[in-house]
């Protein structure tokens, strides 16, 4: 293992924020003894003395219960986000640029041998109905448990296709980038989470509608495809951090600082396939879609923990506490790659992750949307990125990381897949219509 040179680096500590008080009734210990006794007796005997509903409400008013309920109502409404829905229709599919949710699941399928072009058309028609029902809270047709779909918690379902599905429709429509990535020297792919013909990406803030949607989709796909693999990931729970906070991975790093934003002027050029793109790049039928690269990255956390904090920060090039570059500032301060230490060494080492990932070509950027995983004694990162063309965006970045990123000593790429994310669809239309046209 290359030796990590520890260079002292200190930052002022951050001041913890105060927790907000919880609204609602005071605990029983804080209430007068007589008031507590009356409350218990009234609740236990109200029906026996013939008080009825009206009398019970009157007693509640005397004890101030309605006032307490009114005081807590805003907090309850603020926390009640289970019924939130995100529109599934549009020029682009939902789930790519929407605010990341706390839970997600990738499902990859292998088409059955008999699933031909006509069967694929039927499959997409069924999938479209499922997406519309499950994400809206209305439940799809023949859902035996519609109650589980009633509160979708911002559920989105994003559909992608692999090379074999496109080949069965029309081999001439397959983009040149849609296939396995070139082999990188650090790859240790085990075949358990590689490739696929059809991809479903489900995301939600609540695992219950996520699990229900998974079961409904698997039921409806059974006649067309077999499940090849699934991967489940998570991020911080909603409300655990202020809105817009960059996620942390299980190494403790702030993960995803350098990321284009949907509001950026060049975002569309980086992420969405355009009508002017060549057929080899997916132009035409894939306009409004994107290319997804998914990498399963196992983290060697036990050995990572043995590295001292300055060594870990130099490996990344950022501080662990707030993700600021070692050259100073805050998380989003531009990195000074020319900065030197007092003894003349680069503040950002040549092997640092952020230096290896950095490019002076603004078109060589990707839109990252990662999540953590922790299962079966293994922890790591589900690294996902969307781009217009992996050949000119993800691959050059990964080649530089493969050559000299010291972080490679503690991470191993065990799964890899590339999918074409279908364009969006309108009400009354079906996913995949442009592919099948």
Task: Report residues per predicted region.
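Long, histidine/aromatic-enriched segments associated with O2/redox biology
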Residues: 9, 37, 42-437
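N-terminal secretory signal peptides
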Residues: 1-38
């Amino acid at each position: 293992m290359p030796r990590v040179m520890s260079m002292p680096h200190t930052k002022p500590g951050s001041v913890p924020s105060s927790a907000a008080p919880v609204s609602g009734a005071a605990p029983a210990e804080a209430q007068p003894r007589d008031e507590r006794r009356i409350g218990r007796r009234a609740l236990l005997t109200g029906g026996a003395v013939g008080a009825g509903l009206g009398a019970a409400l009157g007693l509640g008013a005397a004890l101030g219960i309605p006032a307490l309920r009114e005081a807590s109502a805003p907090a309850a409404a603020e926390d009640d986000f289970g019924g939130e829905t995100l529109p599934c229709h549009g020029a682009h599919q939902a789930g790519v640029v929407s605010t990341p949710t706390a839970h997600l699941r990738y499902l990859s399928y292998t088409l059955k041998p008999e699933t031909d072009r006509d069967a694929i058309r039927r499959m997409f028609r069924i999938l479209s109905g499922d997406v519309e029902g499950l994400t809206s809270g209305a439940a799809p047709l023949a859902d035996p448990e519609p109650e589980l779909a009633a509160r979708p918690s911002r559920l989105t379902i994003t559909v992608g296709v692999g090379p074999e599905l496109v080949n069965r429709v029309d081999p001439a429509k397959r983009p040149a980038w849609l296939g396995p990535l070139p082999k990188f020297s650090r790859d240790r792919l085990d075949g358990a989470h590689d490739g696929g013909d059809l991809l479903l990406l489900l995301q939600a803030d609540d695992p219950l509608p996520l699990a229900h949607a998974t079961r409904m989709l698997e039921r409806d796909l059974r006649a067309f495809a077999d499940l090849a693999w699934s991967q489940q990931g998570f991020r911080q729970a909603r409300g655990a951090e202020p809105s817009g906070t960059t996620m942390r991975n299980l190494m403790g790093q702030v993960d995803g600082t350098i990321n284009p934003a949907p509001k950026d002027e060049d975002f569309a050029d980086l992420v969405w396939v355009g009508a002017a793109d060549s057929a080899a790049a997916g132009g035409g039928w894939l306009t409004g879609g994107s290319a997804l690269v998914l990498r399963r990255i196992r983290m060697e956390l036990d050995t990572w923990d043995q590295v001292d904090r300055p060594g870990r920060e130099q490996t990344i090039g950022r501080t662990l506490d707030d993700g600021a570059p070692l050259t100073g500032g805050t998380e989003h301060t531009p990195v000074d790659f020319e900065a030197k230490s007092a003894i003349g060494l680069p503040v950002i080492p040549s092997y640092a992750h952020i230096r290896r990932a950095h490019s002076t070509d603004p078109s060589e950027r990707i839109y990252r949307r990662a999540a953590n995983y922790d299962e079966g004694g293994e922890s790591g990162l589900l690294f996902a990125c969307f781009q217009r063309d992996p050949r000119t965006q993800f691959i050059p970045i990964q080649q530089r990381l493969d050559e000299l990123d010291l972080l490679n000593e503690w991470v191993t790429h065990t799964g890899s897949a590339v999918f074409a994310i279908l364009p969006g669809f309108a009400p009354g239309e079906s996913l995949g219509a442009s592919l099948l046209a």
